[in-house]
């Protein structure tokens, strides 16, 4: 064991080093006397059966007379919560990209042979590892077939769907609500309040419309699956790419002849083209000076 990584109500997580394999592992240590011990066993079962790039790999489960040990992949990264708090907020493009990754993980779980609901999507349970999101802490996950009968509702305030507090049946749309709350958090820097505020500026309008479609109070009014939500976020990403690729016209105008306007325009065209932004120079009138300058600068 190297050091403690963290602890919570369900146990303590340590960083361990595998001497023979020369690799680090995360080891979750849970006392068998713990009231939530069954929750730990359930988490181990979920992780053992799930194989996805966004979910940690479980290598082994061991136990002795007093403790059980979950040995899993050690993830190095920054929590989504810490990332957003450090930056203040994320751009629509960055938030949509991470949102698509979240949708893929949740859709994988929701559409498994025995569907699983995560039920506690919140920024501290997501790690950003070199731009890739990894989902951690499966304490509250439930098989969809059992979720409606789950007596005690868990969830993080601001991210949990209303039905997690009212005792109504839970389904994949419960996780969709939380994805919307995460999108809100990423683009604002704070969790949504009891009445989320939406923006009407052009650059935010569609993104906030997507968030609203996730966080409707009635499940029937939300996106009906993480897959449907992912498709909508992908459409938004495609639109953002098209907008970024649109041609722009830059006008160079001089107050008098001979002050270097033509030279500056040609230089800018050359600079943009060499740096991956193809630029076309078009002059309002023809002069031999332009051709001479272009030849000297190597511009054809």
Q: Which sequence ranges carry the predicted segments?
A:
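Activation segment signature within eukaryotic-like protein kinase domains
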Residues: 98-99
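Activation-segment/catalytic-loop signature of the eukaryotic protein kinase fold
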Residues: 61
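AlphaC helix of the eukaryotic protein kinase fold
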Residues: 31-49
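AlphaC helix of the protein kinase catalytic domain
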Residues: 80-90
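Conserved short submotifs of the Hanks-type protein kinase catalytic core
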Residues: 65-79
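Walker A/P-loop NTP-binding active-site region of P-loop NTPases
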Residues: 251-300
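Conserved C-terminal C-lobe helix
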Residues: 202-217
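Protein kinase catalytic-loop region centered on the HRD/HxD motif
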Residues: 104-116
């Amino acid at each position: 064991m190297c050091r403690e990584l963290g602890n919570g109500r369900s146990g303590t997580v340590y960083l361990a080093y595998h001497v023979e394999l020369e690799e680090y592992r995360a080891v979750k240590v849970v006392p068998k006397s713990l009231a939530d011990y069954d929750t730990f066993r359930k988490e181990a079962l979920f992780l053992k059966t799930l194989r996805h790039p966004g979910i940690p790999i479980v290598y082994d489960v061991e136990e002795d007379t007093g403790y059980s040990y979950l040995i899993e992949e050690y993830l190095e990264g920054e929590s989504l919560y810490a990332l957003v708090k450090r930056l203040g907020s994320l751009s629509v493009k960055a938030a949509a990209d991470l949102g698509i990754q979240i949708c893929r993980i949740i859709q994988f779980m929701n559409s498994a042979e025995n569907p699983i609901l995560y039920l506690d999507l919140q920024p501290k349970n997501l790690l950003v590892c070199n731009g890739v999101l990894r989902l951690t802490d499966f304490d509250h996950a439930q098989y969809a077939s059992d979720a409606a009968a789950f007596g005690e509702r868990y969830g993080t305030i601001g991210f949990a769907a209303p039905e997690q507090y009212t005792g109504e049946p839970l389904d994949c749309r419960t996780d969709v609500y939380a994805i919307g709350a995460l999108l809100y958090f990423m683009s604002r820097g704070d969790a949504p309040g009891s009445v989320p505020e939406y923006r009407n500026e052009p650059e935010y309008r569609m993104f906030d419309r997507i968030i609203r479609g996730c966080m409707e109070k009635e499940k029937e009014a939300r996106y009906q699956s993480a897959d449907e939500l992912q498709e909508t976020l992908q459409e938004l990403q495609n639109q953002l790419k098209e907008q970024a690729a649109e041609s722009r016209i830059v006008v160079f105008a001089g107050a008098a002849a001979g002050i270097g306007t033509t030279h500056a325009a040609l230089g800018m065209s050359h600079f943009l083209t060499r740096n991956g932004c193809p630029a076309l120079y078009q002059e309002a009138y023809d002069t031999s000076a332009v051709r001479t300058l272009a030849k000297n600068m190597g511009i054809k």
